[in-house]
Amino acid sequence: MEVEARLRKIFSGAKIDLLLIKNGSEQDPNFKYLTGFTSGTFEDNFLIASRKKVSVLTSELEYETALSQAKEGIEVFNVLGSKKNFKKAISVIKGKSIGVNGNFLSFNDYNKIKKFKPSKIIDISKNLTKARLVKSAEEIANIRRAVSITKFAIMEVQKSIKAGMTELEVAAQVDFVMKSLGASGNSFDTIVAFGKNTALPHHMPDQTKLNDGDLVLIDTGAKYNNYCADITRTFVYGKSNKRAEEMIKFVKSVQLMAIHMLKPGVDAYIVGKKVKKYIDSYKGGIYKGKFIHALGHGIGLEAHDASVFGNTPYRKIKKGMTLAVEPGIYFVGFGGVRIEDDVLIDKNGAIVL
């Protein structure tokens, strides 16, 4: 991991002297991006970065953990246990123009930072998002591994599920297999839905039992070295279900069409609109209005790394981006189908990871 290269990407176009990242009960993903730390929680820790180096302000609790992982360009200071030492360490921001992540920083932490008298506090969340859009070879390798673990886990569980199992049992199996294959955790809580529940895109697994002929939807993602996968599979369990099988076949074809359209220079937002129009017009409109979410999103340190397919500043596709592509159709009272894969944008188009 080249710390200085990542700092150059963040500071490019940002009119700031220093970057300040403040973790809360969870880590700001940009803390992970700049440190590469894969162990430790670093709750309420600070990161202060110049254009050349990163300083982590931590406590006795995390000091050795941070020190053992610090690469070239990263300094670690054990100062959070002492008000005097902390004030001395953070005094570097006094009179300086400070960039912060406005998408993560709490109002209380913003006010705490103001007390140390920076000349300006500027929200550079767009710079941070932009810096992380195009992935390095190391990042791509981590995402590829996370995807591989996720796909294998879903396949293994699909072979072992039986009628009478609950959604919660299947979700637990998926999580167990991913961990046993080396995942450090989940990108998000695993979604498992049976039957009518598959019509709810973000259904959380419950005690619903699997019946013969049910639609089964599994949406999950392993995390590997901080990097996420996001994969969804929908299938019919047991006896044939013609309507459900036709829906699955259609959604798979739509996903292939969408992936084929993703190339450097293409507007992802327009691709999403074209896909929606196609779904709405298919066979006289039998699926009209049933595609109720975006075509996909960025994937990386977060399961939803950036709204590439939305009407956002990040919609122009670039080589090196990693994206999740997830068309779906949903019928309340019957069920839904979503197929999701993660792709890497190469110079010639999208490669399914």
What is each model feature region?
Residues 1-353:
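Active-site neighborhoods and metal-handling regions in enzymes and metal-associated proteins
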